[in-house]
UniProtKB/Swiss-Prot annotation:
Organism of provenance: Physalaemus signifer
Molecular function via GO: toxin activity
Family to which the UniProt record says this protein belongs: Belongs to the bradykinin-related peptide family.
GO cellular component: extracellular region
Coiled coil spans: none
Name of the protein described by the UniProt record: Des-Arg1-[Thr6]-phyllokinin
Amino acid sequence: PPGFTPFRIY
């Protein structure tokens, strides 16, 4: 995904 995140963003 564009921009790593430790959370699942929908």
